[in-house]
Amino acid sequence: MPGRQTVIARDSRYLDLATTLLQRMRLTSAAGGVWEAADVQWWSRAARSTDRDGQVFWLDEAGEPAAAVIVTDFGDTTQLDVLVGPAADADADDAWALALNRAEALRRRGAAIELPLPADSTAGARILTGAGYQPTGEDVIASWLDAARTPQVTTLAAGYRLHNRADTHDRSHPLVPRNGAGVAARLARCSLYRPELDLWVESPDGEVAGYGLFWPDPVTRVGLVEPMRTEDQHQRRGIARHILTSGLARLAAAGCTRLKVSSDIGLYLGAGFKPAIAAAIYAPPA
């Protein structure tokens, strides 16, 4: 059996390792950490400048991911996530040291660095403040809902129709305008993506009025909502509420017991989600 090792992973290997690590972390802590496995799969919907460098993982003696530093270029900001799984204390210091080094290198190239620090990471807070990092005042919100409390599916406005990607795969994906022509293929390679839970609403004139993507994780039984959008000309007609309640019902039917969204806007609070601060955003010294 090999000893512990460090690897650089890209593409499908990266997604597989990140998914396994985040699932292990969620199974260890029901409300700890920041992200779900589905989050990193959603982030892979488009090519990013940080893809070419790969992502660093520490593997345990069994070859399973124990810790990682994930760097994601979101355009305006570059986000660094330090993921430390259960029983990975031996790798934590190395992960934090690498994260700080990569952040400094990216900052020198002009990147605006953000580092979400989990609310339960006292060691991380000590390391970041010791390196001169400070909270920006912005937080990552995690809003949770027990699947048993899923609200009733609302009625869709007259003339509008709800579809899913499985039934409309011959049509351009609703996410193409904001995420590029390759988004459907990129989503299809994600292990947690389900086309029947990729919902969109068609307007009376045949256009996309809104959409929502719902991610069931059969390992953690957490269902993630990401993204949700109603186009401007179709606002205030109950479209988002219908997509949300339809998607939540389908997540529950898929076996999810807890539902999550990284937002605390009224749409989600009205559906029963309870928000909490999952992480504070830290930035490096100027």
Residues of each region from the PLM?
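Conserved acetyl-CoA-binding loop-helix of GNAT-fold acetyltransferases
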Residues: D89-E104, T230, R236-A249, A253, ...
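Flexible, substrate/cofactor-facing loop regions flanked by secondary structure
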Residues: A38-V40, R149-G223
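A structural microfeature
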Residues: A67, T136-D139, A209-G210, I277
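Conserved donor-binding loop and adjoining core beta-sheet/short helix segment
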Residues: R10-S12, Q23-R107, P204, A209-D232
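Acyl-donor-binding surface of acyltransferase catalytic domains
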Residues: T72-T77, V82-A158, A279-P285
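Conserved hydrophobic beta-strand within the GNAT/NAT acetyltransferase core sheet
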Residues: I113-P116, V225, R258-S263
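Conserved active-site tyrosine of GNAT-family acetyltransferases
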Residues: G124, L128, Y268-K274
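A short beta-loop-alpha structural element at the N-terminal edge
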Residues: G3-T20, R161-H173
